[in-house]
Regions:
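Structural signature of hydrophobic alpha-helical transmembrane segments
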Residues: 35-46, 89-101, 170-171, 290-298, ...
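Polar/charged low-complexity regulatory segments
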Residues: 1-116
């Protein structure tokens, strides 16, 4: 997409990418920016980049893109430059304040339409209509309603709207970690992760499938997107699995099942972990600690499912030319940026500061090999790719602000929580099932991070009302928000895997659904077993971890169906 831009547009895109990198690095390491600049610069630059990159098809309509860029600069810049004045006159906004708010809200809808799609936008428009015509709704969800201009003012200027929690998390954490991921990839780390996985388990039973699980765990924890992980690691692992003897739909299903585990795996956990820290008030290091064992159990489950599937098909991979230890000795330094980030956060440094130090570490290690050195040209490429990768989630900020703003403005948050509790009749199990259905439906048109935030606003109060601790409640919602990646009929990541595997989309989707079954067990454990989220005595936590590890193995063994084959059939397949 970048290559299709005109030369002056490319220069503008590069300049904006460097501005994001420099400004937020300075803010994280040297001097924190004031709230309005911290959030405002991010949103303004993101809007400019989106209208540059996701452009209109005809040259005539391209002029509209430029007008939208100017309108974005005007409206968002007005908020930025008049932040303190507007805060002083809350409730007494001027006509100009109102006009700028309306422009900002409408532009946010168009921005999301270009990047995310129509379904997400329709949800935002429905929420706007609900905010205006709430008095016409059924009694259970009715509210007084508001005029459209008044609602836009609330959404645009209040702290729970467009410039609210999502904007803060994206500007404070996500952007720098997405940039870190781009620099880590430029340094050659992705190849090292795959080589290490290949050398360690590639020659074992189901070796290529296990390589996909381990490589996706290593790279997925920093890629920030299950789909990006499938597309990047899957281009290597899926053909390798097919060659070894896995059926195309199995190879295409294993990769997305493994890839979504990266969203749970510390140190980065996609965007959700940072949102969780912001919403719960817990330190991110504690979020990482709570997430580690459940994430390991998820990968253990997928790993064992792959193992038993390979045993059924008698698939054994080829031995690598080098041992895992040899590969690790040759490229151990690729792990240092991740170790640096983890240690810094555990020692109390902010995630943003840690990400910057990790990014510098990526540049340093890149110079250890001539082919991966990050000089000025590759530095600009990494900054550009990082900025571009951030747009998928960044483009949601406006419509999420609309949805959260209307939910808060109307009081619908508490109403929906009461409805969920009422429908579940006080049953925790049914409440979790309802949340799973809501997150799946939400995921049909909303990115998973947005689905998590929107669902959490409604579902967490319902779960805590039933006795689940707040962090465990957020974990339940966050895990279930990933289900749209692999659960039919949506399963976006599974469809990406099917495309690479050249397999039937629905067979691949159900294969991914099968391999990722722990995704549905995890939320139940968070709900019913407090120790799973480190809530209990040390002895009880250790005891429960042992039980869960054994149970996860048994769970995978039973779901794989290999015990049926052991009793009634013989293995068939081939050796790679």
């Amino acid at each position: 997409m970048y290559k299709e831009l005109k030369r002056f547009e490319q220069i503008l895109f590069d300049a904006c990418s460097l501005l994001l990198l420099v400004f937020y690095t300075w803010s994280a390491v040297i001097t924190p920016a004031a709230t309005q600049y911290h959030r405002g610069i991010y949103i303004i630059v993101t809007y400019i980049l989106v209208f540059l990159l996701y452009r209109s098809k005809s040259s005539w309509f391209r002029m509209i893109d430029y007008l939208l860029i100017i309108a974005s600069l005007t409206s968002l810049g007005y908020w930025l430059l008049n932040f303190e004045v507007i805060n002083y006159r809350v409730g007494a906004e001027t006509e100009l304040d109102t006009v700028m708010a309306i422009i900002g809200v409408l532009i946010s809808i168009e921005l999301a339409r270009r990047v995310v799609g129509n379904v997400f936008v329709v949800i935002g428009i429905i929420m706007l209509a609900y905010g205006v015509y709430g008095y016409m709704m059924p009694d259970a969800i009715a509210h007084a309603g508001s005029s459209f201009p008044e609602l836009c003012v609330s959404i645009f200027y209040k702290s729970d709207g467009i410039f609210g929690i999502m904007a803060n998390v994206l500007a404070t954490y996500i952007l720098l970690f997405v940039l870190f991921g781009a620099f880590l990839e430029k340094s050659g780390a992705q190849k090292f992760f795959i080589d290490l996985s290949m050398a360690s388990v590639g020659h074992k039973v189901g070796g290529p499938g296990k390589v996909a699980v381990i490589a996706s765990g290593l790279f997925g924890s920093i890629s920030g997107s299950a789909i990006a992980n499938v597309v990047s690691t899957g281009t290597f692992t899926i053909p390798m699995m097919k060659k070894a003897g896995f059926k195309p739909h199995q190879a295409g299903g294993i990769e997305p099942a493994a890839s979504i585990g990266g969203m749970f795996m510390p140190p980065i956990m996609g965007a959700g972990g940072f949102l969780m820290a912001e919403l719960t008030g817990q330190s991110y290091s504690w979020i990482m600690a709570v997430s580690l064992f459940p994430a390991l159990m998820y990968f253990f489950s997928v790993f064992m499912m792959v193992h038993y599937e390979a045993r059924k098909l008698n698939i054994v991979g080829e031995r690598s030319a080098h041992s895992g230890w040899t590969v690790l000795k040759a490229g151990w330094y690729y792990i240092t940026p991740l170790v640096l980030i983890t240690l810094l956060m555990l020692y109390g440094y902010s995630p943003a500061y840690s990400a910057v130090i990790g990014l510098v570490g990526c540049i340093v290690i890149s110079w250890l090999r001539p082919g991966t050195r990050i000089g000025p040209k590759r530095f600009l490429e990494a900054a550009r790719e990082g900025a571009e990768n951030s747009l998928k989630i960044g483009a949601t900020v406006g419509v999420i602000g609309i949805i959260i703003g209307v939910l808060t403005y109307s009081g619908l948050v508490l109403t929906l929580a009461d409805i969920v509790i009422s429908l579940a009749e006080g049953s925790l199990f049914l409440t979790i099932v309802l949340i799973a259905l809501v997150s799946l439906i939400m995921g049909m048109g909303v990115p998973v991070t947005a689905a998590y935030l929107i669902t959490a606003v409604v579902a967490v109060p319902a779960l805590t009302h039933l006795g689940v601790n707040e962090l465990a409640a957020h974990m339940i919602v966050y895990w279930l928000s990933q289900d749209s990646n692999i659960t039919p009929p949506v399963c976006i990541a599974a469809f990406a895997g099917a495309n690479i595997a050249k397999a039937d989309m629905w067979k691949t989707a159900f294969s991914a659904f099968k391999f990722a079954k722990f995704l549905y067990l995890g939320p139940l454990l968070f709900g019913y077993v407090p120790e799973f989220s480190l809530d209990g005595s040390t002895f009880d936590i250790i005891k429960v971890f042992i039980y869960i590890a054994i149970g996860t193995w048994l769970y995978s063994y039973i779901l794989s169906g290999i015990w049926l084959q052991t009793w009634f059939g013989k293995r068939e397949g081939k050796k790679a």
